[in-house]
């Protein structure tokens, strides 16, 4: 079972927006050393929208090779074209990914039946574990619990990243699926409570900069130690809030640069973190113990 702290890994770039393979390698090592339970490559935080297909598959291939089976690698392969999502998912399987994360189609706003057919088609076309991803704040598409319940019985669909931040939504999904269907948080601010409800982990932006703390939080929450989990959550709250002071992954890439983990690089239309946000994020890193 894929569970625990799953980092939504950034894709390091230089100042010209070229992929920085050396920094990527060092970030993977950082997570292996700090207790991260799985790596999600080229998802939203990994800037999948601005990577071309060859770059997309090369990031996955390199992460898989470096991890070498020590923890699961989940590849972001969602698209708003079903045909393209099948292609990306096939490529990820060929590259050795353990599972794929598929965001709901964005911009074209399919119906609930369209969502069911989209994800069912991909699951039937590519034999690899697949995780649904619902983040309506980014996609303008909200997959309802009834649709999730229908999809939960489709072969190869093993779980969902629920990123609405709505705990009632998580409760509704948990109540409508079997116990072996994995419900993950995709919202750092509410992740601890979702896991205490029965969720199996957190696909986390905050884990990029605080992997050990997020791993400890997830472990405590999943064993039912609410006191410990909530105490760690309180420590991380400044980061959970400030890492979204501008659009993700702008702040987290700046934070990793501030930590000396990667160059100052991001691709248009995203831009580097505005100067007014530097000190608030620096203070959050200090308050959470990431910077001294």
Curated annotation (Swiss-Prot):
Its EC number is 4.3.3.7. It comes from Pseudomonas savastanoi pv. phaseolicola (strain 1448A / Race 6). Catalyzes the condensation of (S)-aspartate-beta-semialdehyde [(S)-ASA] and pyruvate to 4-hydroxy-tetrahydrodipicolinate (HTPA). The lineage of its organism: Bacteria, Pseudomonadati, Pseudomonadota, Gammaproteobacteria, Pseudomonadales. PANTHER family: 4-HYDROXY-2-OXOGLUTARATE ALDOLASE, MITOCHONDRIAL, DIHYDRODIPICOLINATE SYNTHASE. SUPFAM superfamilies: Aldolase. The active site is at 133 (proton donor/acceptor), 161 (schiff-base intermediate with substrate). Keywords: Amino-acid biosynthesis, Cytoplasm, Diaminopimelate biosynthesis, Lyase, Lysine biosynthesis, Schiff base. Pyruvate binds at residues 45, 203. It is found in: Cytoplasm. It catalyses: L-aspartate 4-semialdehyde + pyruvate = (2S,4S)-4-hydroxy-2,3,4,5-tetrahydrodipicolinate + H2O + H(+). GO terms for cellular component: cytosol. It comes from the Bacteria. Homodimer. InterPro entries: Aldolase_TIM, DapA, DapA-like, Schiff_base-form_aldolases_AS, Schiff_base-form_aldolases_CS. GO terms for biological process: diaminopimelate biosynthetic process; lysine biosynthetic process via diaminopimelate. The record marks 44, 107 as: Part of a proton relay during catalysis. GO terms for molecular function: 4-hydroxy-tetrahydrodipicolinate synthase activity. This is 4-hydroxy-tetrahydrodipicolinate synthase. Belongs to the DapA family. CDD domains: DHDPS. It is an enzyme of class 4 (lyase). Transmembrane segments: none annotated. Pathway: Amino-acid biosynthesis; L-lysine biosynthesis via DAP pathway; (S)-tetrahydrodipicolinate from L-aspartate: step 3/4.
């Amino acid at each position: 079972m894929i569970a625990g702290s799953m980092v939504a890994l950034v894709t390091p770039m230089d100042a010209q927006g070229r992929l920085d393979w050396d920094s990527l390698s060092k970030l993977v090592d950082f997570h292996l050393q700090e207790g991260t339970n799985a790596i999600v490559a080229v998802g939203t935080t990994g800037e999948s929208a601005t990577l071309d297909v060859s770059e997309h598959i090369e990031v996955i291939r390199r992460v898989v090779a470096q991890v070498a089976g020590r923890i699961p690698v989940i590849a972001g392969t969602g698209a708003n074209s079903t045909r393209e999502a099948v292609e990306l998912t096939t490529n990820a399987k060929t590259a050795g990914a353990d599972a794929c994360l598929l965001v709901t189609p964005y911009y074209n706003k399919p119906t609930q039946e369209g969502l069911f057919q989209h994800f069912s088609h991909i699951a039937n076309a590519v034999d690899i574990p697949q995780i649904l991803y619902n983040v309506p704040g980014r996609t303008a598409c909200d997959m309802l619990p009834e649709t999730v319940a229908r999809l939960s019985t489709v072969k190869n669909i093993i779980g969902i990243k629920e990123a609405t931040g709505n705990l009632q939504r998580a409760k509704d999904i948990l109540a409508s699926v079997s116990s072996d269907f994995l419900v993950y948080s995709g919202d750092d601010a509410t992740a601890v409570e979702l896991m205490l409800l029965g969720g199996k982990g957190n696909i986390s932006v905050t884990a990029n900069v605080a992997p050990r703390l997020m791993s400890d939080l997830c472990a405590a929450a999943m064993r039912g130690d609410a006191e410990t989990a909530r105490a760690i959550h309180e420590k991380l709250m400044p980061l959970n809030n400030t890492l979204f002071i501008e659009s993700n992954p702008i702040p987290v890439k700046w934070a990793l640069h501030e930590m000396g983990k990667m160059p100052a690089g991001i691709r248009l239309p995203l831009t580097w973190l505005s100067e007014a946000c530097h000190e608030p994020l620096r203070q959050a890193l200090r308050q959470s113990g990431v910077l001294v």
